[in-house]
Amino acid sequence: MFAKLSLLSLLFSSAALGASNQTLSYGNIDKSATPEARALLKYIQLQYGSHYISGQQDIDSWNWVEKNIGVAPAILGSDFTYYSPSAVAHGGKSHAVEDVIQHAGRNGINALVWHWYAPTCLLDTAKEPWYKGFYTEATCFNVSEAVNDHGNGTNYKLLLRDIDAIAAQIKRLDQAKVPILFRPLHEPEGGWFWWGAQGPAPFKKLWDILYDRITRYHNLHNMVWVCNTADPAWYPGNDKCDIATIDHYPAVGDHGVAADQYKKLQTVTNNERVLAMAEVGPIPDPDKQARENVNWAYWMVWSGDFIEDGKQNPNQFLHKVYNDTRVVALNWEGA
């Protein structure tokens, strides 16, 4: 579908979308969202309940799927991580924005996560090297203290510096009219990332700071905002999330559909948000999704061995999935 039509044409031509059981229809939380961002959310809503949009993290792994399975995933997952100032200071370089623009040129969907290196206080030891700097154990940065500095503290200003650095990259995408599924501050309740290390309150405050800085200060509106928790204590709220997601890494060979998490997230969102799997190891079996009525809108396989080792997702299974008429790929023509 995306190989044939632009996002804007999808917004205005529901007939081109093929069969669809539209179960949810709501506008973007950002009332100033660009036409492209509105079209992207609308497209996902139109597929929700009848199709499952395929995704693959990392351009190398995306290319692997296209080469070895013969079908290209609809969504490319990329990471803003090496645009973080702390990473740049250690020589980090990134071509993520270039990858995103290229994928948009294929009429693909782009999803961006941000493994945010702590703004300062990376331990940078043999045990905890700088490149682990988004992990709680690898930094002494305290998010609770930073967000409660009331705009005057050094660490608060460093948070803004980092957000500004990512906003500069989002602006490049905005100028290219590229909408993105933006999933910042992911997996907060795990506590293994510094933004979730001090509990829900500072995490939620940081979410608000980030959203305000990007949309109001930088006037950027080309994002569909993706939250990433099924824990009600950590969920920012439907007024702050366009799509609600989980990350799901079951045992090797388990292609179940995480029905318990789906139901939990339905409750958390009051059945008012599209639900998706922002990261997976083994892909949920589309037959099981349909049979159990667990309608994750999309799934994004993590990179490297998760897609390439032949164990997490055996090639025979991948061929089955990508040739299923319910699975949306880049060259999907509709069921």
From Swiss-Prot:
One GO biological process term = substituted mannan metabolic process
Keyword annotations: Carbohydrate metabolism, Glycoprotein, Glycosidase, Hydrolase, Secreted, Signal
PROSITE patterns per the record?
GH26
Q: Which residues are glycosylated?
A: N21, N142, N152, N323
EC main class here is hydrolase
InterPro entries, from UniProt? GH26_dom, Glyco_hydro_26, Glycoside_hydrolase_SF, Rhodanese-like_dom
Per UniProt, subcellular location reads as: Secreted
Reactions performed catalytically: Random hydrolysis of (1->4)-beta-D-mannosidic linkages in mannans, galactomannans and glucomannans
| Residues annotated as binding substrate | W192, Y249
What GO CC annotations are associated with the protein?
extracellular region
State if Cytoplasm is listed as a keyword. Answer: no
Similarity comment: Belongs to the glycosyl hydrolase 26 family.
Q: What is its EC number?
A: 3.2.1.78
Q: Which SUPFAM superfamilies match?
A: (Trans)glycosidases (SSF51445)
Q: State the pH dependence.
A: Optimum pH is 5.0.
Species whose genome carries this gene = Aspergillus niger (strain ATCC MYA-4892 / CBS 513.88 / FGSC A1513)
Active site positions, chain numbering: E187 (proton donor), E279 (nucleophile)
Q: What is this protein called?
A: Mannan endo-1,4-beta-mannosidase man26A
Catalytic temperature dependence:
Optimum temperature is 45 degrees Celsius.
